[in-house]
Amino acid sequence: MIVVFRHESTIGHVFLTGGDYHSGAGGFSRAPSTAVTYVAPWLRTSQFPGGDRGLSGGGQRGRLWAYGPGYVEGIYVPPYQQAYTTELRTTCTCTPSRSRPGQVFTTCRSAIHPCAGPRVDSCVQHAGCVRQTTRGDKRKLNMSDSPKNAQKVTDEADVVLVGAGIMSATLGAMLRQLEPSWSQVIFERLDGAAQESSSPWNNAGTGHSALCELNYTPEKNGKIDISKAVNINEKFQVSRQFWAHQVEEGILPDPKEFINAVPHVSFGHGADQVAYIKNRYNALKDHPLFPGMQYADDEETFTEKLPLMAQGRDFSDPVAISWIQEGTDINYGSQSKQFLKAAEAGGTEIRYGHEVKDITKDGAKWKVTVKNVHTGDTQTIRANFVFVGAGGMALPLLQKSGIAEIRGFGGFPVSGQWLRCTNEELIEQHAAKVYGKASVGAPPMSVPHLDTRVIDGEKGLLFGPYAGWTPKFLKEGSNLDLFSSLRPTNLASLLGVGVQEMGLTKYLITEVVKDMEARMESLREYMPNAKKSDWELITAGQRVQVIKPVGAPRFGSLEFGTTLISNSEGTIAGLLGASPGASIAPAAMIELLERCFGKRMIEWGDKIQEMVPSYGKKLADEPEMFAELWEYTQKTLKLEKA
């Protein structure tokens, strides 16, 4: 069956078949007198199989989107490619709206030309057209003539980014400013940006800078080790500077949509925890990266700072808190979307609903095989550089690439759940991110905290996370993910960790069997008067903890941080692990640039320093610079005191 659409402002026709289509918004008038099937605006053509796809006029003269696959005058159109109608003419020429290397244009000698239009980014090849490309071709969008050979279609790009989350968004933003002529393509298996780990409901939204997170300051032999806390804080200062620069450049136009001031508080109860909180405070209070840290262990101050946590509390059990007012709550989903909106405006192509299935070496380049999750069609794209920012799926994709650097690495998935407050009165009584001590054997992502969140301008309150276990590597993943990642080269690492981490195993079993009442008991350590009727259980994101190969007798080490993997040539890289994750994305991506593009760093140095003024320096050794940059980022990011 053939469906013919006729745009009211044109004389040309577009023929499409296959898939399941809607006509565009107000863009189609009655059918011509020839025998055709007419589809009214937004009317579904249910005769076509293949799910709910659409055609949208988009308000532009003669433009249609084929969410196919489909046919344009008998010529196969791959899904998500643009098709155009225009007026009848004997000859016509498609020319790009912006003349730049890599644009494709077609000279057409057809009476009815479905390609021409006011803007041509990828011209649909048409019977009678002569295919040409501009000189200095960097990116060719080749289209097949028939469904039979559609899978052989190969695009080319300078950079392919796997995953439309905060990591790919950050790296893409950096590379666009360092090398604006490089073409970038992003593939995302879901139908929108930042819907997995970067989604605000799938993470704590903490701007991790070790202001309150106790797992960054372990106590050894009665002494607090602050080295990890200082390192995390240094990296978060890089994030603040980079984000402030992006705000000034208009890339992140509204900082209040993604970052808000929320005090960070460390909390302990019982004699041992109180002693630890005090020792930690004494170790950090004079450090230049932790200015303004305060401490209290009296009932009056505790009640003033944390009224919700004071209600119903028996203060005969000692308590202590330390805090810094200038903590942050971050919506990484909103931030990712701002980055990616600017990316599309700058020429980056983002293909949602496309899952990367394989990455293979192709000479000095990489061949990336991608599947359209809606139609099942596959395509390949050849890239000079590939970044795998696919969350938990980074491990199996890097394994498929065959690089030596991933040998021996494994992944241990840990899921999470939150209690979300549904009582607006309670939400308004709490204004802090309060972190306590983790249970013995618990992974850092399971450190309990009572969190004020600001999501889409609305204040919320979460408690958790409660850890769980599933073999999935993504929240929207498969139960076969873990088993698919097993290799002869990483079995020793996995078994070694299994023997060593019995405490973690016991902890996860305990967490998995908890019912709602048991979860409420954990909450009541923070909020004694908590009632089950005021809270609901929601599922958080999935994290894959890194298992790193080490020598005998351990064979494997369970890592709770973020690990960057890259090959020796610097042509492919990926990010493994969990916390601190998104908080240090800019620092992680600068490390990637140094590893993979070392020869360009001298050329890029000035631009990187413009984006991150402290680049190459340790702010812990530069207190005056830290103070200056702190004030700059506070003002630019609109972080008034909480």
From Swiss-Prot:
Pfam families in UniProt: Mqo (PF06039)
Keyword entries, A-Z: FAD, Flavoprotein, Oxidoreductase, Tricarboxylic acid cycle
EC number(s) reported in the record: 1.1.5.4
Annotated region (Unknown), positions in chain: 1-142
Cofactor: FAD
MQO domain: annotated segments: 143-642
Family annotation (InterPro entries): FAD/NAD-bd_sf, MQO
Pathway(s) annotated for this protein in UniProt: Carbohydrate metabolism; tricarboxylic acid cycle; oxaloacetate from (S)-malate (quinone route): step 1/1
GO BP of this protein: tricarboxylic acid cycle
Keyword Transmembrane helix: no
GO molecular function list: 2-hydroxyglutarate dehydrogenase activity; L-malate dehydrogenase (quinone) activity
PANTHER family according to UniProt: L-2-HYDROXYGLUTARATE DEHYDROGENASE, MITOCHONDRIAL (PTHR43104:SF2)
Record-given protein name: Probable malate:quinone oxidoreductase
Organism: Corynebacterium efficiens (strain DSM 44549 / YS-314 / AJ 12310 / JCM 11189 / NBRC 100395)
Lineage, uppermost ranks: Bacteria, Bacillati, Actinomycetota, Actinomycetes, Mycobacteriales
Gene giving rise to this polypeptide: mqo
